[in-house]
Design a protein with these regions (language model features):
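Signature of the first transmembrane helix
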Residues: 5-66, 233-257
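Helix-terminus/linker motif at the lipid-water interface of multi-pass membrane proteins
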Residues: 23-42, 111-118, 174-181, 246-277, ...
Length: 333
């Protein structure tokens, strides 16, 4: 397969998958705004930075381990790649459960820190309490989606993401519109969708269709530290990018609540959804090229890595121009 075909085989599914992950939040916002109310949408917006934080954790572990695994596969070290894969999934599972337990214990403090006032506190609590329960699936599903691409199955990433998205839309309609469950319904719909996504990806890896599969591992403390350190180093840039998004939304939320009123958060939510869609496109390009770059780095094919980077810059530039034109000429629409 030519390098151009490989590039688009991985990048296009990654962009679509990232769009789908963005749609989770947008769909929740749409149904909450139309069938619950403005205050409910504002409560969802308050919790968005926490959801971004969950994705940041998923990114640093998923992208970091994807790079390590890609390099090992490029070198032909399949056993080592499977060892890293199994270890990182077990680590994510344990870490995300601990994170969820801490969030449950400090739920009220987290909500106040996020900026919820007395008007939004209970609504934000209703939404976050459900999100926290499903948070391990948020992190694992995203990590699985990244790792299934380095396994050579970018289309499976789309299948998992789209299946979950469709489920989310259907459940949002049923739980928010039909059962009038408000923000709890929105959070429950998204949580179940993330669980479904996890299940689809788990079945793929359990079936051992590609290079990666779960194996029995025995690692020393030195090995654990070594792989965690490399994971953090490789995934840190993407982690900071996602954390910046969370910080940006968090600061805007605080200013709007302090100097305007909670109702204005619903208007900001719409703007945030549009910017989320744009940033997801660029993240999709990044995540799509990473498996190729790490593989060719491992196989020491530097010329191919350089060509992929060049194609990425050109592709991102073209997409940026198109998006700017749409935003400029279609702002009123």
């Amino acid at each position: 397969m030519s390098l151009n075909k490989q590039f688009f085989k991985f990048v296009i599914p990654s962009i679509i998958a990232m769009w789908v992950f963005s749609i989770y939040t947008i769909v929740d916002g749409f149904f909450v705004a139309n069938f619950a109310g403005e205050l409910e949408l504002s409560a969802v917006t308050i919790v968005v930075p926490y959801v971004n934080f969950l994705f940041a954790i998923a990114i640093i572990t998923g992208v970091g381990s994807q790079t390590i695994i890609g390099i090992e596969l490029g070198k032909g070290n399949r056993d080592e790649a499977n060892k890293v894969f199994t270890f990182i999934i077990l680590f994510i599972l344990a870490f995300s459960v601990v994170l969820a337990l801490l969030a449950i214990i400090f739920m009220n403090q987290i909500i106040r820190f996020l900026g919820a006032d007395s008007t939004l506190f209970h609504l934000s609590h209703d939404y976050l309490s459900v999100i926290v329960f499903f948070s391990p699936f948020y992190i694992i599903a995203y990590a699985f989606e990244v790792l299934v691409k380095v396994d050579g199955f970018p289309r499976t990433a789309i299948i998992g993401a789209v299946s979950a998205c469709v489920t989310n839309i259907i459940l949002d309609y049923i739980l928010i519109h039909k059962f009038q469950m408000g923000v709890r319904g929105a959070a429950l719909a998204t949580g179940i969708a993330q669980f479904l996504s996890c299940l689809i990806f788990f079945i793929h890896f359990r079936a051992a269709k590609g290079y990666l599969r779960f194996v029995k591992i025995k690692m020393s403390a030195k090995e654990v530290f070594h792989y965690l350190k490399k994971t953090v180093v490789y995934g840190f840039g993407e982690f900071i990018s996602e954390l910046n998004t969370a910080t940006f939304v968090f600061i805007f939320n605080l200013f709007i609540i302090k100097y305007l009123s909670p109702e204005y958060l619903s208007a900001y939510a719409v703007i945030n959804y549009m910017s989320l869609f744009a940033s997801s496109t660029f993240q999709g390009v990044c995540h799509g090229t990473l498996p190729l770059l790490s593989y060719y780095h491992g196989s020491e094919e530097r010329d191919k890595s350089i060509k992929i980077i060049r194609m990425s810059f050109i592709f991102v530039f073209i997409i940026s121009v198109i998006m700017y034109a749409i935003a400029y000429f279609g702002a009123e629409t």
